[in-house]
UniProtKB/Swiss-Prot annotation:
Subcellular location: Nucleus; Chromosome
Function: Testis-specific histone H1 that forms less compacted chromatin compared to other H1 histone subtypes. Formation of more relaxed chromatin may be required to promote chromatin architecture required for proper chromosome regulation during meiosis, such as homologous recombination. Histones H1 act as linkers that bind to nucleosomes and compact polynucleosomes into a higher-order chromatin configuration.
Primary site of residence: nucleus
Protein name: Histone H1t
Sample GO molecular function, one term: double-stranded DNA binding
Family, as annotated: Belongs to the histone H1/H5 family.
Tissue-specific expression: Testis-specific.
PTM sites of type Citrulline: 58
Matches recorded under InterPro entries: H1/H5, Histone_H1/H5_H15, WH-like_DNA-bd_sf, WH_DNA-bd_sf
Start and end residues of each stretch annotated as Disordered: 1-31, 116-207
Residues covered by the H15 domain: 40-113
Chain positions of site Important for nucleosome binding properties: 56
Source organism (scientific name): Homo sapiens (Human)
Post-translational note: Phosphorylated in early spermatids. Citrullination at Arg-58 (H1R54ci) by PADI4 takes place within the DNA-binding site of H1 and results in its displacement from chromatin and global chromatin decondensation, thereby promoting pluripotency and stem cell maintenance.
């Protein structure tokens, strides 16, 4: 009897272990893992491109200046130093960034002309166009004064020919009157001579 009891207890223990539910370790899908790994890299690249688009340095921003800009944006630069360097290298290889100085992750970087956002280009164009408009307006504001003075100077010239023409008309009228008056005088003289001759003839006939 002593030998059968332990065997029964052992079989009962094995059956109980089989009945217990086995916990399976859940595995995350591959897509979630890759996404979680890529998110910090994407955020770093976005922050770098934004910092370079805002900067007005023609030569480009150095690595130290980029780190300062990222720290000001709230990014932990000390913990993610290696990620910053890797993202810089990948952006240079993709052609998004241009390395103006240095080699590798050290040196100065700036955005390539193809990747400059349209907003910055439009702002630059607007500023240039606004400056040109101001210059044109200032020139135009000066030019009307000269135009007014020229108009004032031209007005007497327009009035003078009228006076000259009126004077010419008056002279022409006087000349015509003078030309007409000698004819009248001649006609009156001829009439007087005719009357005188008639009177003389009458006197001679009476004699």
């Amino acid at each position: 009897m002593s030998e059968t009891v332990p065997a029964a207890s052992a079989s009962a223990g094995v059956a109980a272990m089989e009945k217990l539910p086995t916990k399976k370790r859940g595995r995350k899908p591959a897509g979630l893992i890759s996404a979680s790994r890529k998110v910090p890299n994407l955020s770093v690249s976005k922050l770098i491109t934004e910092a370079l688009s805002v900067s007005q340095e023609r030569v480009g921003m150095s690595l130290v200046a980029l780190k300062k800009a990222l720290a000001a944006a709230g990014y932990d630069v000390e913990k993610n130093n290696s990620r910053i360097k890797l993202s810089l290298k990948s952006l240079v290889n993709k052609g998004i960034l241009v390395q103006t100085r240095g080699t590798g992750a050290s040196g100065s970087f700036k955005l390539s002309k193809k990747v400059i956002p349209k907003s910055t280009r439009s702002k630059a164009k607007k500023s240039v166009s606004a400056k040109t408009k101001k210059l044109v307006l200032s020139r135009d504001s000066k030019s009307p004064k000269t135009a007014k003075t020229n108009k004032r100077a031209k007005k007497p010239r327009a009035t003078t020919p009228k006076t000259v023409r009126s004077g010419r008309k008056a002279k022409g009228a006087k000349g015509k009157q003078q030309q007409k008056s000698p004819v009248k005088a001649r006609a009156s003289k001829s009439k007087l001579t005719q009357h005188h001759e008639v009177n003389v003839r009458k006197a001679t006939s009476k004699k």
